[in-house]
Amino acid sequence: MNKIRVYYEDTDASGRVYHANYLKYLERGRSNLIYQSKYNHQELFKKFNIIFVVKSLNINYLKPAFFEDIIEVQTSLNLLSRVKLNFNQKIIRNNELLVDAEVIVIPINSSGKIIKLNEELYSFLNTIS
């Protein structure tokens, strides 16, 4: 779980977080899940020639976050296969659910071709789920 401060630049004219900015917060949550392990994204690319890209996203905006709020992004890897990672993510303020999202990520190589996770990477990802 990581905490994020909402800055003025994140908000719309009403002082609420602009809807597209929640996607940035979700991305940070998924990245931080990787960073808490033994790799980062650049190391994954160098070692495995792999990049993770979003294939689909389902997001429910339940309540707004506002300028200067401190929000938390909770991320869990719910389903892992050789060609797909399914994340459940929540954005919370003071134990109140603001956003609930399901994000499906797929592995591609530097040419943009979908690839399968090898055994080492699959086992590693199983440890963070």
Across the structure, where does each feature detected by a protein language model lie?
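HotDog/MaoC-like acyl-thioester-processing domains
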Residues: 2, 35, 66-67, 78-129
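Hot-dog-fold acyl-thioester-processing enzymes
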Residues: 1-54, 109-129
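Short amphipathic alpha-helical "recognition" segments used for binding
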Residues: 28-31, 59, 93
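Short, positively charged
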Residues: 43, 49-50, 68-70, 86-88
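Acidic-enriched, low-complexity/disordered segments with a strong bias for Aspartate over Glutamate
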Residues: 10-12, 69, 100
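Active-site beta-strand->loop segment that positions catalytic residues and contacts the acyl thioester
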Residues: 55-70, 76-82
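Generic structural detector for well-ordered beta-strands
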Residues: 3-7, 58-60, 104
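Alpha-helix boundary/capping detector
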Residues: 48-52, 59-60, 101
